[in-house]
Amino acid sequence: MKLTGALGDFDRTRALLDGRVRVAGFDVEWQSGELESIFSRALEGAELDITELSFSNFLVATAKGVCPYIALPVFPTRCFRHHALFIRGDRGIRAPADLEGKRIGLREYTNTASLVLRGILAGYYGVKLERIRWVVGDVDRRERTTIRIPELPAPYQVVAETKGLLSDLLETGELDGLIAYAPPRCLGRNGVTRLFERWWEEEARYFKDTGVFPIMHVVVVRRSLVERHPGLPRALLDAFSEAKRIAIRDLEIESAPRTMLPWASANLIQAREVLGEDFWPYGLAANRKTIETQIGFSRQQHLISRDVALEELFVP
């Protein structure tokens, strides 16, 4: 049976994309491309049989009862987001609590990176999110003609920025801070810096204290396909697990390293010391706490209006 799938091109997915690993019993035509485009194709047109998807947007769609997909416990993208918080150094922001009363920009209010970082700020650092004025817009280049913002209860404040770019507004001082996946072009100008200068240490500390390694994206499958082909989820999980095994094996090679990072093997040792031997786990058992934490973030931030059980999100 021929299926269409779309994934980001990562070390843990590359063996699927290039054909080294195949899905037993199914002919999957894998595609890759910009993740925002992949997500749009999935959520707006439901044109893909298997796809990588934003965890937050998948959760919101499922809670509303409008998602045609169900998830596998496979997480192609995970990321601590402490490093994604940029600030003006002249606004008296020395700690997370100092963000209260400030104007903070972000590309999208509902995406997983923003959800997780706000959840960490509130739950771990005690920041009152409703005391921040959130400004949603494009960061370094114009991407959209319409900026969507959610309807949130008072006193939450979320506004759309349709004229300027958030990076420019941070540089000129019209914003006090910015959540951005990648360093904005204004970094280093006019005192723009990261709130957490040694973010990797702060992220490791967060994991040691909470046991949560945030999930950004999840792999989902069309529900109707799972109903017709109950063996598909297991075949996919096995294939993704094998692709991940190949990626980890490549990281372990020291004789002729596969990556240009000079201390990649040391980074691997460090990751295992902090996160455990299987530092990028698949499966529900190893990820239950992280998933339930992020569902809680979404509920607390009013992105979903009801509790969502793991059984609604993931294949049995």
Residue map of PLM features:
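Extreme N-terminal starter segment of soluble prokaryotic enzymes
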Residues: 1-4
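Short, glycine-/small- and polar/acidic-enriched structural segments
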Residues: 11-130, 134-137, 141
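Short helix-initiation/N-cap motifs at beta->coil->alpha
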Residues: 30-41, 94, 132-171, 309-316
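Pocket-lining segment of extracytoplasmic ligand-binding domains
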Residues: 145-251
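Secondary-structure end/capping motifs
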Residues: 220, 226-300
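Short hairpin/turn module used for nucleic-acid contact or packing/dimerization
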Residues: 290-316
